[in-house]
């Protein structure tokens, strides 16, 4: 039985649910990123209040610090984090890809020096599956190679075929409590993406992700990959666009049939003083906000906007106060969760195009863009 239930469609966009043992996730969904077992500056209770039903943990970083021995000793990742809802863990493939020349790639896997202390580490499909099983992931991801950009056709083909072989090994090795998703690779090449998808479908994964995007390609290239690939994705499985992205990326991904997203953008930008609003991005360091008594977004119902001014948040940002990072993060995650809720409601009502038109109209007309 599929873990995905389709509730409504509007064009290619889907409104549905993903049923997991620790809870049901309403889709389209955005997953806040908790790299080291914490969504930076947020408590689990705050995440729940904001509407987060699933978060992302990072296999690579958690394996290196605090390590599986510590996580197992305290009862697993959920108990350690005090989070009783679903967690998706990535496989570590993207982080290994990010090491560049510091890694040695073979058919068996990847050898690299740990950025924490320099000791040699080997990570392959079997090791990644063992780690994710020990973490107790509700959704684990196959170990893959993130195809670099730009890549020639031959480079993308070789990388994609390696990822398919690793997917088969991941599938055979995984014995965790959760679901295991496959990852479509193939760079910017439509036929390679379709070949990757076909190979993954033969392994019958309960969900499929689109990897290898948001790695330096243009927005036009990203959307072209989705336009080529999404019509071929199975309708009865959740579809996860990895590491993407901006509010515009979320709207366009949903319009093309994506169900799940994750990105560090709302939390990272919050720490840098960039706040997402319905009218664009508010950059707190701009001197125009020095004496501004308005909240970041007067129409926003989040705790930050209900209680604090742009002037105060700017002061906290310039003073490097921890409270500023917390208030900014709370606002940005509220914005992202509200955006997803609005998209879900629009799909259910059959008015997604009107919702998207209003989204872009407000951002074009807003006085905050580039501020």
UniProtKB/Swiss-Prot annotation:
Zn(2+) binds at residues 300, 302, 305, 331. One of its GO terms (molecular function) is metal ion binding. InterPro entries: ArchSynthase1/Queuine_TRR, TGT, TGT-like_sf, tRNA_ribo_trans-like. It comes from the Bacteria. Keywords: Glycosyltransferase, Metal-binding, Queuosine biosynthesis, Transferase, tRNA processing, Zinc. Its EC number is 2.4.2.29. One of its GO terms (biological process) is tRNA wobble guanine modification. Residues 243-249, 267-271 are annotated as: RNA binding. It holds the Pfam family TGT. Homodimer. Within each dimer, one monomer is responsible for RNA recognition and catalysis, while the other monomer binds to the replacement base PreQ1. HAMAP family: Q_tRNA_Tgt (MF_00168). Catalyzes the base-exchange of a guanine (G) residue with the queuine precursor 7-aminomethyl-7-deazaguanine (PreQ1) at position 34 (anticodon wobble position) in tRNAs with GU(N) anticodons (tRNA-Asp, -Asn, -His and -Tyr). Catalysis occurs through a double-displacement mechanism. The nucleophile active site attacks the C1' of nucleotide 34 to detach the guanine base from the RNA, forming a covalent enzyme-RNA intermediate. The proton acceptor active site deprotonates the incoming PreQ1, allowing a nucleophilic attack on the C1' of the ribose to form the product. This is Queuine tRNA-ribosyltransferase. The lineage of its organism: Bacteria, Pseudomonadati, Pseudomonadota, Acidithiobacillia, Acidithiobacillales. The gene is tgt.
């Amino acid at each position: 039985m599929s873990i995905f239930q389709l509730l409504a469609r509007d064009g290619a966009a889907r409104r549905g649910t993903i049923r997991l043992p620790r809870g049901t996730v309403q889709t389209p969904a955005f997953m806040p990123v908790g790299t080291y077992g914490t969504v930076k500056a947020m408590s689990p209770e705050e995440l729940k209040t904001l509407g987060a039903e699933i978060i992302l943990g990072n296999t690579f970083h958690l394996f290196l610090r605090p390590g599986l021995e510590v996580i197992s000793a305290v009862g697993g990742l959920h108990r350690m984090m005090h989070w009783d809802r679903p967690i998706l863990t990535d496989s570590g493939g993207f982080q290994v890809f990010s090491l560049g020349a510091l890694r040695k790639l073979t058919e068996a896997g990847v050898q690299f020096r740990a950025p924490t202390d320099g000791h040699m580490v080997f990570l392959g499909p079997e090791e990644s599956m063992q780690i994710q099983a020990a973490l107790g992931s509700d959704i684990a991801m196959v170990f893959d190679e993130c195809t670099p950009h730009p890549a020639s056709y031959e480079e993308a083909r070789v990388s994609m075929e390696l990822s398919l072989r690793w997917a088969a090994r991941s599938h055979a090795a995984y014995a965790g409590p959760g679901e295991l998703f496959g990852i479509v690779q193939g760079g910017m090449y439509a036929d390679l993406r379709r070949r990757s998808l076909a190979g993954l479908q033969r392994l019958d994964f309960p969900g499929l992700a689109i990897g290898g995007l948001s790695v330096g390609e243009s927005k036009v290239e990203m959307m072209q990959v989705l336009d080529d690939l999404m019509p071929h994705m199975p309708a009865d499985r959740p579809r996860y666009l990895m590491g993407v992205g901006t509010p515009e990326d979320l709207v366009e991904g949903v319009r093309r049939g994506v169900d799940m997203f994750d990105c560090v953008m709302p939390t990272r930008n919050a720490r840098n003083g960039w706040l997402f609003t319905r009218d664009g991005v508010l950059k707190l360091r701009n001197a125009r906000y020095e004496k501004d008594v308005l909240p970041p977004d007067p129409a926003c119902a989040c705790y930050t906007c209900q209680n604090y001014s742009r002037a105060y948040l700017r002061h906290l940002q310039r003073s490097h106060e921890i409270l500023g990072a917390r208030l900014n993060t709370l606002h940005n995650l509220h914005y992202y969760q509200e955006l997803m809720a609005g998209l879900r409601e629009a799909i259910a009502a059959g008015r997604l195009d009107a919702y998207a038109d209003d989204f872009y109209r407000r951002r074009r007309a807003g006085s905050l863009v580039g501020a």
